[in-house]
Amino acid sequence: MDWDWGNRCSRPGRRDLLCVLALLAGCLLPVCRTRVYTNHWAVKIAGGFAEADRIASKYGFINVGQIGALKDYYHFYHSRTIKRSVLSSRGTHSFISMEPKVEWIQQQVVKKRTKRDYDLSHAQSTYFNDPKWPSMWYMHCSDNTHPCQSDMNIEGAWKRGYTGKNIVVTILDDGIERTHPDLMQNYDALASCDVNGNDLDPMPRYDASNENKHGTRCAGEVAATANNSHCTVGIAFNAKIGGVRMLDGDVTDMVEAKSVSYNPQHVHIYSASWGPDDDGKTVDGPAPLTRQAFENGVRMGRRGLGSVFVWASGNGGRSKDHCSCDGYTNSIYTISISSTAESGKKPWYLEECSSTLATTYSSGESYDKKIITTDLRQRCTDNHTGTSASAPMAAGIIALALEANPFLTWRDVQHVIVRTSRAGHLNANDWKTNAAGFKVSHLYGFGLMDAEAMVMEAEKWTTVPQQHVCVESTDRQIKTIRPNSAVRSIYKASGCSDNPNHHVNYLEHVVVRITITHPRRGDLAIYLTSPSGTRSQLLANRLFDHSMEGFKNWEFMTIHCWGERAAGDWVLEVYDTPSQLRNFKTPGKLKEWSLVLYGTSVQPYSPTNEFPKVERFRYSRVEDPTDDYGAEDYAGPCDPECSEVGCDGPGPDHCSDCLHYYYKLKNNTRICVSSCPPGHYHADKKRCRKCAPNCESCFGSHGNQCLSCKYGYFLNEETSSCVTQCPDGSYEDIKKNVCGKCSENCKACIGFHNCTECKGGLSLQGSRCSVTCEDGQFFNGHDCQPCHRFCATCSGAGADGCINCTEGYVMEEGRCVQSCSVSYYLDHSSEGGYKSCKRCDNSCLTCNGPGFKNCSSCPSGYLLDLGTCQMGAICKDGEYIDDQGHCQTCEASCAKCWGPTQEDCISCPVTRVLDDGRCVMNCPSWKFEFKKQCHPCHYTCQGCQGSGPSNCTSCRADKHGQERFLYHGECLENCPVGHYPAKGHACLPCPDNCELCYNPHVCSRCMSGYVIIPPNHTCQKLECRQGEFQDSEYEECMPCEEGCLGCTEDDPGACTSCATGYYMFERHCYKACPEKTFGVKWECRACGTNCGSCDQHECYWCEEGFFLSGGSCVQDCGPGFHGDQELGECKPCHRACENCTGSGYNQCSSCQEGLQLWHGTCLWSTWPQVEGKDWNEAVPTEKPSLVRSLLQDRRKWKVQIKRDATSQNQPCHSSCKTCNGSLCASCPTGMYLWLQACVPSCPQGTWPSVTSGSCEKCSEDCVSCSGADLCQQCLSQPDNTLLLHEGRCYHSCPEGFYAKDGVCEHCSSPCKTCEGNATSCNSCEGDFVLDHGVCWKTCPEKHVAVEGVCKHCPERCQDCIHEKTCKECMPDFFLYNDMCHRSCPKSFYPDMRQCVPCHKNCLECNGPKEDDCKVCADTSKALHNGLCLDECPEGTYKEEENDECRDCPESCLICSSAWTCLACREGFTVVHDVCTAPKECAAVEYWDEGSHRCQPCHKKCSRCSGPSEDQCYTCPRETFLLNTTCVKECPEGYHTDKDSQQCVLCHSSCRTCEGPHSMQCLSCRPGWFQLGKECLLQCRDGYYGESTSGRCEKCDKSCKSCRGPRPTDCQSCDTFFFLLRSKGQCHRACPEHYYADQHAQTCERCHPTCDKCSGKEAWSCLSCVWSYHLLKGICIPECIVGEYREGKGENFNCKKCHESCMECKGPGSKNCTGCSAGLLLDMDDNRCLHCCNASHSRRSQDCCDCQSSTDECILPAREAEFYEHTKTALLVTSGAMLLLLLGAAAVVWRKSRSRPVAKGRYEKLAEPTVSYSSYRSSYLDEDQVIEYRDRDYDEDDEDDIVYMGQDGTVYRKFKYGLLDETEDDELEYDDESYSYQ
């Protein structure tokens, strides 16, 4: 029975239990894999073998011995522990980990390791006794008898004499058969052991299946003996071969470490053909011991040259495994070898990854030939396969290379392999050449190994430079990996260029450490792109990997960047492709990643290492798919950017294919370039595409594919999008333009550690979030713990951690005690009741109080006398009794003492104080003076004035390591609200009204009722404007409901007043009154009862069940009327009815007097019962007044009717010409029909129409009129005033008119608009500007014209260019951020009424240079002569209070303070920390050591250190000290300091000066420009360097920066202005055909078809040029391609464009809107021109500089004006020199001979051109919605425009690509057209 599992498990609506269980088992299988613990331990013990034995014995272990070559690592065995257990061991022996000498211990876990051969189940082993040499095909690829086209050239190496002699190779496997005839001759016992059996014999364990044949097979490939007529030949048949048996048992970390480190000084090469399971779901690698063994091996193996480890890459191809999940092949220390089949095709078992270094042969399909080698039981096999066969083959080739050069290091070997391996005929679809020129593949690494090339390279090899390791840690920011999407992270690496010991310039290995959490690891794919563009696949999707463990610091490695440069942008991409087995869409997270770059700082290859690669294989040419790109008509050289395919011309736009990348121009021409420019990314197939508008760099064109952002945007790295506001939990990092993550405990922040709001359970302490403990508790780093019972408050555990003591305890020397100790007394004098024990006077043994007069007992030898301790009568003061009873003199510093040393004082002279038995000048900083004695401060204080915790004067970290800060005499752990922790450990106040800050100038959070005001970040009172209310919770002004001028926080919708244009109703404001209300004087009033809509006069309609009657609502309409249910009105009954149910004559319910009711009809009682002729007409309803007048007229007519009742027909009324019953239908001449009656004159609101003969209504807004558009008086209402203008009524007068008495009158010139009277202007004509209602030619002083209105400059501003942008401040004020301030902020200094930034090292400064600092930005730096230094220079010391370097005393050479000399100047010696001369000499003398007497100074010196004139300290009057010499006048470069009588060096920028600072220059050095008294290499913004005068001259005030004084010399513009680059001008609003780029602050050209636009794309048009009309933002041509419109209206003709234009808007060559291929459009005069580097352009006067731009044409001629300007200085200087040399006559002669300078303009063409005015299309619907789509922002997207010709044919602009190019996102066609049938 066949089970259709696929259908069964995927069929919708069905859930089979067996299917579900099977899927669950598959998903949980990796999770349920059990660890097996052994009874073996690995232990690291310091102290040697004996110490290890002692510890092992103590805890019941047996010390088996050292683990391999790992020093201090030992193998312990415990016989009483279960041999194999799923639980780790417990018991007393586990206490070994607590031994001090035990540094590390690990119980060994069994690892699963798989041999990397493949056993074909159907193949029967065939054994041969004959020699196999002829059948070893992989040795004979060069003899043309085998399909393998590429040879490993092993015979070539043999012919050069290399066979592996003296090289030792060890096979790490299941043992080797050392007795095999092909192995026994080369067997090396020193390279062999049995780790599984713990002996030295590697012989395999034999069984019936011959399972342990693997190691013997691998060994035969390497070193099978040649010419012994037994079986086969090894690649290195004279090499020594050993084996380590380690796979035939439990494989643990210790087993592996022993194996890979076995006898490393003897073994050269270790070969391993095993690894973790190749099941497609395992992620495993070497554990700590094995990793250590690898590192030790490469560092110390082979006597420091490094062991060589060769590893098989893996056989998990069928399981879709990826060898990057194998930590052995993924290591930089191993050489990972893959396999290729004889045909060069990929074997089915092969895994691919970026760590594979090279390839050797193995088998492919089952029918392919396999590898011949030795086998168990002294036999041979021709069935060896898999990567297991490839690794030993590589080990053999490496052995040949090591024989050729035994001094190759382990890295040399890898370099040699990289340089000599080659692609050959190996078939892979991902071969690529990296930036260093190496061809590499994920399947085969650098290709097939070449033995001959390797030995040739090794012979002349020079050891590569030392390996450098650079760890580049990226920002740790978690990114969400969403299903079916990618996460990209970019990191700009420097290669550790700032650290010479770690600098990596040229790469070898690149390791990426990644931590990822994910619900299904197998769905992930990871890529890394190097700065050179080489893309490595670090991980591919793995179908069988269901693990939810993700990756934890897993190291992926790539060798694909070998030889490339390290510095630049590295891009990591993580893709999540959910599999069908994944039933949930939980996103993963990229938690962190880092780069480890391995390589060298210098080029690794010396000239002797240069070796040309030679392809040694039979080459059969494969047809190049690009051969179609011939260049039949062109035979010249191609542009360097063209590929080898060729070109059809010399320029980069003539390439048939590009070498690197290409642009597409507007006209679809492709230009080849070397790299994509900023704002673009490298798309597939060498194409440069544009990033999304907000991206600075990107990896795709969508808005969520940004890598960095433009200014003003921040990169949200989770979404890879650029946002203007970062999401919650992150902050705006302005320096990096990214959204940085707040620290873990922050809810909101302004920096990683600068929290402004904390998560639940935490409180803000300063700028960090931490736990706040209650009184009586302290925080130990994890939680709150109770203080010691003696403490009321504390900062740590124990009685010595108290801050205050509990009741009944007092503080003594930092501890809380119940009573004072001996020699202490209880002090009650402290403020606030604080009690403490203070030390007694030193003369007392015990005391009752302070001082020497409160003693209660005395020391031995002293007598108590009235509270004082007196010396006995034997000795005097200043003496003590020695042991012999004699009086001896105290040490000189003591007044009284009890011993001879300076520590035995008991009282001191008046100039000193007593401190612990010493008499000192001052108490140390941690003590305070009281009663001439030093007492310790409270332990929280650094300095103090008393013993309490509130008597501190300075703070530091306390004894518990807690940082403390001074606040009101207390040292606190955290500063209170409104203060910040400053340097010096003090809490300093924040700016006024600030609650949280980090310096005294910038506030982060204001107090309640205040808000932060940028840009200074100060707090101002929260004063809400009209229409806002103060939100107390968020402390900001929130808007009231729409229309409110005032409201309250309790109910923002309850308005106190309304804005203009809004109506008030029940405390709410409405744009229009709500239902059932009407507006009167901007108030809504309720309609009458039951009225649904009304005005102040009447109701318009009523609620259901009521009827409108006479302007009010009634339920019963009354007699003569009936309720019309449909209209909701009371309608009159027929005139015959008294009551009725409808208006018809037959709907009466009762009749008028004299009439009778008959079937609903009222009839005369005398009439026959037939319908009357006139009774079938209802009376029309009109306004009540009109109805009333008509009824009166009808009453008279009724009487007439009664009189003529006998007549059958009645005549019309006399006023009617014709009638319809009693109503007129038309009127005679002179009468007009109105309400079915004829009137002689029309009523108000109507006018007599001669044409219709009736009274026509005036327009609704007109009270009286004389014609349809001839209003005479407009309707006037209080809330709706209308004005009469030219016979029509308007709400406001048109431009140029003002309202007077309800009529629009003309404004007087030059008013454009006015109000109130003709001269009260609101705006002005032409160039006039408005100021206070008057139009002037220019604005008054301190004003600026903004949109034609004079605006006052900002406060304190002298001159401005915008109402918010000041250019020059009034005296005593300084310009900062476009505003004027009384003083400059921190990090700025005032200069020429401007705030100029300090150097980055300075917090405060008086100039821009690094030596102009007044306060350092880095608090750890020391300030010396304006410089911020790490340490103070010799002769100075650091003053801790202000971090300044102060000069040592004059005699001091080195000092630590002003009073502590450490070394003295010549002639002085240190005595008691002071430099003193042996003898005091006179001021004009010095001490001569030779004669031991004072000698006179030189006559030029005032004070000196020796006899010569260059040994002066000071100088006589009117001379000045220059270094150590006295001079009469200071030389140039120095200024004279008359106060100190010294020559002080000028600043390095000054030539002459008046002081040492950069702001005190009088003249500048050559090449510098003077600005005020400052010399600059480059003038600051607002100035330019004038080379003739050497000064910085002012730019025109319209420029922010410039190259000259004119308004056309601007290079950048101030805020609110935009630079028009082509003119060099700054514009407030961009001119016609340009739009304002708000980010770049430039005016950019619209698309050629746009007249006005919002962007440069073709779809951003707002209006169009002639011959185009607007449709959804695109200007569509009205003629077919190549033609333009001629004529207006619907009947127009289409004429052909000029031959140079592809599209145009008019005739001639200067009306082009699109160009043909190879031409670029000059936007300024709409011409199509060639590139200047094109051959045919050399004949043309004008051409485009395509090097500058490929998007539009830039004429080289436009540079002329700039160059002309820069040459001005040279011309002026030359003229001055000629004046001096030749005189006036020569100048006249020169002028007469001079020729006019050519101006940088264009020559007017003779061909006439017609200009066509632009117009706005009327086709744009008012309700048109332009939908935004997230799309590719590419420069050629707008080219795909479809338009229709006059004949109905639809045309399209087409895009052309290379013929071999296919793109999923874009179709490319030939010309096509469609016709509508």
Curated annotation (Swiss-Prot):
Q: Which segments carry the FU repeats?
A: 632-682, 685-732, 736-779, 781-826, 834-881, 884-929, 931-981, 984-1030, 1034-1079, 1081-1123, 1127-1168, 1206-1248, 1252-1299, 1301-1345, 1347-1390, 1392-1438, 1442-1487, 1491-1536, 1540-1585, 1589-1636, 1640-1685, 1691-1738
The positions making up the signal sequence are 1-34
GO BP terms in the entry: anterior/posterior pattern specification; cardiac septum development; coronary vasculature development; cytokine precursor processing; determination of left/right symmetry; embryo implantation; embryonic digestive tract development; embryonic skeletal system development
Q: Which residues form a coiled coil?
A: none
- Membrane-crossing ranges are 1769-1789
Q: What does this protein do?
A: Serine endoprotease that processes various proproteins by cleavage at paired basic amino acids, recognizing the RXXX[KR]R consensus motif. Likely functions in the constitutive and regulated secretory pathways. Plays an essential role in pregnancy establishment by proteolytic activation of a number of important factors such as BMP2, CALD1 and alpha-integrins. May be responsible for the maturation of gastrointestinal peptides. May be involved in the cellular proliferation of adrenal cortex via the activation of growth factors.
Record-given protein name: Proprotein convertase subtilisin/kexin type 5
